[in-house]
């Protein structure tokens, strides 16, 4: 298999602390660049775990359509500003940040007090503007998750009336683009391809880490396929019929026929079912009269055997 290299050819950090990384992957066999690009993009955009604000409690407010005295932004604007926060929480449980401030003040993300397990990526993100003589008290809930989680309106009745739920966007990768270029090869050789990927994150993770995590998820997805073996199913043997389990003694054969069959290791009807008429004649001291006697005894219980052995 053709070995390829991965080079990060560009890395930029924007004013909002989002990061953009451009990676060059190649050379690849024809068609592999599309397969690799689509697979990585799918996992990067929807499969990585991230952190997001899931709920906000504002003192004195119990619904999102209210206004707060002395605050320029209404509640919906504050919720939207909190939803857009880029946050990285290392705690698998819910983290709660708190804000208690007096005006005049322009509240920014850095003013929210979290535990040491929560990092606010863009601390300059505005939250609200408070006028003199007024205050604002907030409680912000942060969780970890994957993908997009809309508010479940059915469960809102079980939550506190003043806890305002937010549609949570846990995706740390904001955008992924890729292009495919053909590389020059020697005359007569199969064409090669190069994959250029641009990964934009919200800053809570780097493009390098995002690519690595996506690749590891794909490895875990495909790893079981590498050990697939075809197990031949052994057909279950059908259970013998009640007639087949009848012992030889119950057929009421003559002493001569009975003794000959016993010497041939025939002990039940199931053993006889493996014989043909020709096979019976080959038993030592077993003539046609004895063979006919066995055939008649089997027919009385509804069993017949072939005249001649089946040729293989």
Swiss-Prot record:
User: Which is an annotated Pfam family here?
Assistant: RNA_pol_A_CTD
Please provide the Gene Ontology terms (biological process) for this protein: DNA-templated transcription
Write the record's keywords in alphabetical order, separated by commas. DNA-directed RNA polymerase, Nucleotidyltransferase, Transcription, Transferase
Query: What are the annotated GO cellular component locations?
Result: cytoplasm; DNA-directed RNA polymerase complex
Region of interest called Alpha C-terminal domain (alpha-CTD), as start-end residue ranges on this chain:
246-312
* Cysteine disulfide links: none
Under InterPro entries, the record lists: DNA-dir_RNA_pol_insert (IPR011262), DNA-dir_RNA_pol_RpoA/D/Rpb3 (IPR011263), DNA-dir_RpoA (IPR011773), RBP11-like (IPR036603), RNAP_asu_C (IPR011260), RNApol_insert_sf (IPR036643)
Transcription keyword on record? yes
User: What EC number(s) does this enzyme carry?
Assistant: 2.7.7.6
Q: Which reaction does it catalyse?
A: RNA(n) + a ribonucleoside 5'-triphosphate = RNA(n+1) + diphosphate
Q: What class of enzyme is it?
A: transferase
* Chain positions covered by the region annotation Alpha N-terminal domain (alpha-NTD): 1-229
Q: Which GO terms describe its molecular function?
A: DNA binding; DNA-directed RNA polymerase activity; protein dimerization activity
Quaternary structure?
In cyanobacteria the RNAP catalytic core is composed of 2 alpha, 1 beta, 1 beta', 1 gamma and 1 omega subunit. When a sigma factor is associated with the core the holoenzyme is formed, which can initiate transcription.
Q: Which family does it belong to?
A: Belongs to the RNA polymerase alpha chain family.
In UniProt terms, what function does this protein have?
DNA-dependent RNA polymerase catalyzes the transcription of DNA into RNA using the four ribonucleoside triphosphates as substrates.
Q: What is known of its domains?
A: The N-terminal domain is essential for RNAP assembly and basal transcription, whereas the C-terminal domain is involved in interaction with transcriptional regulators and with upstream promoter elements.
Q: What is the designated name of this protein?
A: DNA-directed RNA polymerase subunit alpha
């Amino acid at each position: 298999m053709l070995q390829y290299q991965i080079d990060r050819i560009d890395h930029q950090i924007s004013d909002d602390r989002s990061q953009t990384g451009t990676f060059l992957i190649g050379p690849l066999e024809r068609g592999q660049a599309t397969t690799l690009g689509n697979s990585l993009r799918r996992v990067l955009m929807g499969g990585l775990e991230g952190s997001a604000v899931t709920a906000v409690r504002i003192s004195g407010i119990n619904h999102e359509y209210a206004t707060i005295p002395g605050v320029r932004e209404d509640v919906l604007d504050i919720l939207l500003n909190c939803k857009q926060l880029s946050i990285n929480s290392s705690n698998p449980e819910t983290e709660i940040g708190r804000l208690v401030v007096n005006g005049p003040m322009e509240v920014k993300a850095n003013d929210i007090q979290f535990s040491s397990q929560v990092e606010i990526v863009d601390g300059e993100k505005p939250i609200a503007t408070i006028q003199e003589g007024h205050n604002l008290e907030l409680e912000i809930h942060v969780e970890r998750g994957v993908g997009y989680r809309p508010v479940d309106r059915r469960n809102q009745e079980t939550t506190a009336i003043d806890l305002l739920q937010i549609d949570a966007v846990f995706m740390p990768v904001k955008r992924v683009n890729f292009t495919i270029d053909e590389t020059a090869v020697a005359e007569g050789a199969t064409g090669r391809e190069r994959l250029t990927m641009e990964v934009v994150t919200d800053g809570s993770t780097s493009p390098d880490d995002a690519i690595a995590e996506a690749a590891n998820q794909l490895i875990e997805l495909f790893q079981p396929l590498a050990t697939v073996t075809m197990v031949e199913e052994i057909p279950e043997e059908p259970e013998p019929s009640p007639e087949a389990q009848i012992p030889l003694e119950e057929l009421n054969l003559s002493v001569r026929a009975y003794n000959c069959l016993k010497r041939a290791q025939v002990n039940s009807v199931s053993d006889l079912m493996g014989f043909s008429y020709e096979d019976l004649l080959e038993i030592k001291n077993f003539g046609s009269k004895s063979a006919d006697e066995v055939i008649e005894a089997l027919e009385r219980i509804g069993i017949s055997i072939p005249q001649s052995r089946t040729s293989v």
